[in-house]
């Protein structure tokens, strides 16, 4: 009897969910004070496709089911917090990117070395400390709260027990800081490394050219002084001076002495301000002769989830980062991104950029879970994915997206699958993943997206509306006319992986638009970029899942991954 009632209840919930999903194409724009989608045609249609899955129509008819109250975990190469439409919702105030974590360890810095700061003789408002690089670093006293000292519990007066006499207490001790060091090139993507190297080389060439000009002027003056017209003989000292000038010129003109550029060295300072641990990075702008020249621009960063602030290494690289602290702040984690892939994926799922250019679920919040290792060219590892799954559970994600995949021999097995099953079945977190770009042959799906029954595997689809703006394909027949779209045929991309798996599973659950032009990392020097692949199809499906979860939460419908998957597949 109980099982029958449970079955009837589940059927009722599923019917309610289907009634929400079934929408009619919107014929006009619906205005809403918090709406983020437009039902009218737009010149941006096709850049970030939403009509193919009726996501645009769904949010137009249900403006408050736009993904709000849903948290999407993006397991990828990291998200740039400064990218367009990523940090805040459409109102510019409500946080969208609510946390950033690095599960690879590529940004970890050992800051276990402690030193006590000293008074700065040049400025009473500053303290100073010698960093591990050997540079003297200046710190603003205002960075500490008014009540913070290492001996804050010390009384201003001390009384001896024997005599009862009162003596003035010694001055409070200056605070301690923790120091670390990190090469900037260990954080930067390869494209940023090359750009910074070119910038540093141009600066070096300018300085070298100035020295060359000075030496050549000295040689010219020497030759004029001892020319035949002057009839003056050089002394041994004059000859040594000429030889010295010539030797300096030869060294400056010789390129063999040039070695590989190691890049900037970042001094990391971690301190407790009385409320939270904070970190400051010195040395990012190597155009300055003194790292303290940019003191006014430095912002002591707390863990990103607390204040949601981020820093930029320098204006040349435009590399944005956040920080976290581990092991009682003895390890500083610098969290950035290693390719624009993760930011692009996040933009497809939940970009907030007005009614025409928003992502599939613009009201959803994001958590950046970095699993692509910067030291390995953005490649993932088993340990990073396992940590990412555990982080998604710990941080309270509702759905996660993984646009990564590798080949495997045994489907539905391994440590990653065990953790994924526990996350899906025990914690009710839906796992959406790309199936791979190894098609069109059969049984080409990747793991874990196409090889695990607990994961919602997504293949890539291209519609006629996507072909024109993305690939400049106006028609695939000779009959071009007003109804040009009728000449196109929507289909899966030729390279989209196909099932079944070795154990007979389908491998692919659904198809979703596999291309988009949307936001990318600031360090690319671009606002948006075209990318295509099942990596782009998966976050689109993830955004659709977020829309349904948002509707279920608003309507009081219990959420479970099988219910959402069944509703989408049907």
How would you describe each model-predicted region?
Residues 370, 401-405, 432-435, 459-460, ...:
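A cross-family glycoside hydrolase active-site/sugar-binding cleft signature
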Residues 83-89, 110-112, 413, 444, ...:
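Short, solvent-exposed loop/turn and secondary-structure capping segments
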Residues 58-214, 218-221, 225-244, 248-252, ...:
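Subtilisin-like serine protease catalytic core
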Residues 387-393, 408-413, 419-426, 439-447, ...:
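Hydrophobic, small-residue-rich alpha-helical packing segments that form membrane-like cores
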Residues 308-319, 330, 449-546, 550:
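Extracellular S/T/G-rich loop segment that most often corresponds to the catalytic His/Ser-adjacent loop
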Residues 76, 436, 533:
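Active-site glycine-centered loops adjacent to acidic/histidine catalytic or metal-binding residues
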Residues 346-349, 367-373, 444, 514-570:
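Hydrolase catalytic cores
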Residues 78-81, 103-108, 373-375, 405-409, ...:
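Solvent-exposed loop/turn segments at secondary-structure junctions
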């Amino acid at each position: 009897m109980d099982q029958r009632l449970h079955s009837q209840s589940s059927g009722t919930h599923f019917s309610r969910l289907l009634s929400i999903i079934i929408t009619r194409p919107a014929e006009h724009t619906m205005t809403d004070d918090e709406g983020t989608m437009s039902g009218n045609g737009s010149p941006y249609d096709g850049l970030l496709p939403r009509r193919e899955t009726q996501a645009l129509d769904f949010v137009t008819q249900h403006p408050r089911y736009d993904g709000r109250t849903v948290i999407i975990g993006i397991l990828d190469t990291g998200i740039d917090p400064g990218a367009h439409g990523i940090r805040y919702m459409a109102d510019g105030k409500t946080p969208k990117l609510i946390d950033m974590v690095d599960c690879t360890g590529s940004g970890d810095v050992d800051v276990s070395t402690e030193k006590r700061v000293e008074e700065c003789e040049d400025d009473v408002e500053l303290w100073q400390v010698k960093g591990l690089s050997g540079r003297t670093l200046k710190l603003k006293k205002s960075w500490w709260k008014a009540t913070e000292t290492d001996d804050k519990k010390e009384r201003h007066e001390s009384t001896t027990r024997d005599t009862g006499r009162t003596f003035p207490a010694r001055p409070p001790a200056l605070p301690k800081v923790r120091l670390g060091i990190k090469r900037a090139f260990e954080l930067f993507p390869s494209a940023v490394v090359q750009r910074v190297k070119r910038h540093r080389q141009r600066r070096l060439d300018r300085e070298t050219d100035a020295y060359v000009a000075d030496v050549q002027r000295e040689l010219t003056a020497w030759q004029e002084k001892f020319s035949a017209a002057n009839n003056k003989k050089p002394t041994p000292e004059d000859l040594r001076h000429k030889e010295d000038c010539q030797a300096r010129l030869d060294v400056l003109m010789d390129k063999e002495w040039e070695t590989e550029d190691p890049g900037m060295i970042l001094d990391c300072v971690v301190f407790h301000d009385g409320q939270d641990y904070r970190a400051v990075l010195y040395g990012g702008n190597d155009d300055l002769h003194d790292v303290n020249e940019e003191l006014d621009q430095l912002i002591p960063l707390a863990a990103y989830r607390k204040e949601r602030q981020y820093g930029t290494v320098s204006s040349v690289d435009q590399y944005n980062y956040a920080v976290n602290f581990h092991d009682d702040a003895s390890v500083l984690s610098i969290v950035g991104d290693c390719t624009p892939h993760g930011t692009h994926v996040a933009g497809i799922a939940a970009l907030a950029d007005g009614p025409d250019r928003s992502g599939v679920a613009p009201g959803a919040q994001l958590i950046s879970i970095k699993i692509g290792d910067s030291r390995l060219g953005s490649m993932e590892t088993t340990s990073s994915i396992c940590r990412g799954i555990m982080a998604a559970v710990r941080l309270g994600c509702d759905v996660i997206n993984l646009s990564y995949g590798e080949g495997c021999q045994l489907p539905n097995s391994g440590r990653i699958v065990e953790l994924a099953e526990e996350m899906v079945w025990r914690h009710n977190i839906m796992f959406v993943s790309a199936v791979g770009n190894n098609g069109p042959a059969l049984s080409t799906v990747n793991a874990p997206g196409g090889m695990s029954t607990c994961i919602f595997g997504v293949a890539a689809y291209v519609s006629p509306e996507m072909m024109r703006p993305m690939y400049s394909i106006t028609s695939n027949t000779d009959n071009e006319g007003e109804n040009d779209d009728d000449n196109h045929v929507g289909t899966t991309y030729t390279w989209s992986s196909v099932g079944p798996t070795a154990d007979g599973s389908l491998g692919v659950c659904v198809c979703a638009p596999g291309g988009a032009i949307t936001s990318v990392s600031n360090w690319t020097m671009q606002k948006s970029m075209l990318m295509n692949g099942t990596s782009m199809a998966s976050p689109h499906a993830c955004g659709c899942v977020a829309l349904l979860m948002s509707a279920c939460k608003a309507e009081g419908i219990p959420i479970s991954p099988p219910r959402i998957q069944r509703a989408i597949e049907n």
